[in-house]
A protein has these predicted regions:
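HhH-family (HhH-GPD) DNA N-glycosylase catalytic core used in base-excision repair
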Residues: 1-256
């Protein structure tokens, strides 16, 4: 398929799938239930953190987590007492357990107290160096400066170890992109959509390989860079708009 034909096809899929009609069973549905920016940011991060496995289970468990945080994730993160944090002890999503959840709240609290909010961390750090790869590394380092158990570290991928950082890339997409379609939020104005990286998983990876957008076999950070650079050839200003298009084509068997 010629590049122009591929772009036309992916643009059609983007128009089909990048719509509020398709987000009911997507993890982005949970932060859409909030209106305050700081709540959207923290809910979005925690929802993205548990975004693996069955999508309906992800959404259900993320809503359960928000209920335990009194549907006020920013206030809970910054101000919850130890007794209130213990409400999270029996929360589980697959291998993400209650102890991990509490450790993540501690990490987020450390970030929010240091920078004022989660968004201010990412915007401040991006403004300082202009490279999301550096920001991802800095975020993980600062996040785990807070007290935590080693088990929690497995749930925040390390770009320094070559991980694809799918959930962090997805969270950044939600916060940065603004296409006025009511899907992504576009809250962080100082980070351009052109700087984002594709949230790479088995579905988007296999679809990208089938389309010739990705040749690397492993779904690691080098693959993320390769496929993102290919998508920038299709749309330099907003390459990650094709995320839903690749995902939808993969799970709906459009390449068969």
């Amino acid at each position: 398929m010629e590049l122009s034909e591929l772009k036309e096809w992916l643009d059609e899929l983007y128009d089909r799938y990048d719509s509020p009609d398709f987000i009911e069973n997507d993890p982005i549905a949970i932060p859409h239930s909030f209106s305050k920016q700081e709540d959207i940011e923290l809910c979005g991060f925690l929802s993205a953190t548990i975004a693996w496995g069955n999508r309906k289970m992800i959404v259900r468990n993320a809503f359960r987590l928000m209920e335990r945080m009194d549907r006020a994730p920013f206030d809970f993160t910054c101000n919850a007492s130890e007794q209130e944090l213990n409400r999270l002890c029996d929360f589980t999503h697959r291998t993400f357990n209650g102890g991990d959840c509490i450790d993540f709240i501690r990490g987020l609290r450390h970030i929010c107290r240091s920078y004022g909010s989660l968004g201010r961390f990412f915007e401040t750090e991006y403004s300082a160096n202009g490279d999301l790869r550096v920001v991802f590394s800095r975020f993980r380092t600062r996040f785990f400066e807070a007290e935590h158990r080693p088990h929690a570290e497995k749930h925040l991928s390390s770009i320094d170890r070559g991980a694809a950082c799918k959930r962090l890339c997805m969270f950044l997409k939600w916060m940065v992109r603004n296409d006025s379609r009511g899907v992504d939020f576009g809250l962080w104005k100082t980070i351009p959509a052109s700087a984002l990286y594709l949230p790479l998983d088995i579905h988007t990876g296999n679809t990208a390989r089938a389309l010739g957008l990705l040749h690397r076999r492993q779904n690691d950070w080098r693959a993320v860079e390769e496929v993102t650079e290919a998508l920038r050839q299709l749309d330099p200003l907003d390459p990650i708009k094709y995320d839903f298009a690749l995902f939808g084509a993969g799970i709906n068997g459009l390449l068969r």
